Amino acid sequence: MRIDAISIGKNPPEDVNVIVEVPVGGHPIKYEMDKEAGTLVVDRFLYTPMTYPGNYGFVPHTLSDDGDPIDVLICNTRPLVPGCVINVRPIGVMMMEDNSGQDEKIIAVPSAHLTKRYDKVHDYTDLPEITLKQIEHFFEHYKDLEPGKWVKIFGWKDASMAKQLIREAVERAKTKK
C-alpha cells in the first residue's frame, strides 16, 4: 500500500479517511502500519485479554505530538479488514497520556454515505453513555499487564476540538516533510 497516495479526505477535518489497523472485536493484537513500507506489522500482543471497542487506525498525512499519525477510534459494530480505508466524521476526542506522552484518540463515526446509522451523531455526547464508558475502560486498562506501561485519561472534548487537533496534525505533517 502506498500511504502517500491515500487522500486525507474529501473535506478535512469535517470528513477524513482512516487507514484501519485493528478491527473492532478482534483478537488482542496491536497492529501498526509501517508508514514507509506500506505494510501492516504486528506491533505487540496485548497482555490483557481485551478487544478494541471500535475499528482503530490513523488519518494519513497527519502527525501528532507523539510522532505518529493521529489515532482514530471508529464507533461502529462491524469489523473492518486491517489495511482498508474508511471515510469518517470526527465527533470528539478522548484526552489521554501514556508512558510515551500525550496520545489523544479522535472518536469518529462512518460518513453518512456509508451508513445512515450515525446520522444523528454529531458529537461524542450523542453516543450512548455505555459506549463512552467502554472506550474509556478499554484505553485505561489495555496496557495494565505490560511492564512499565501506563495510561491516564483526562476526559473528553467535543467535535470542534477533534477537528482542531486534526488541522494541527495536518500542518505538523506538512512542516516535517
Swiss-Prot record:
* Cofactors required: Mg(2+)
One biological process term from GO is: phosphate-containing compound metabolic process
Keywords in UniProt for this one?
Cytoplasm, Hydrolase, Magnesium, Metal-binding
Q: Where does Mg(2+) 2 bind?
A: 71
Q: How does it assemble?
A: Homohexamer.
Q: Which family does it belong to?
A: Belongs to the PPase family.
What exactly does this protein do?
Answer: Catalyzes the hydrolysis of inorganic pyrophosphate (PPi) forming two phosphate ions.
Name assigned to this protein: Inorganic pyrophosphatase
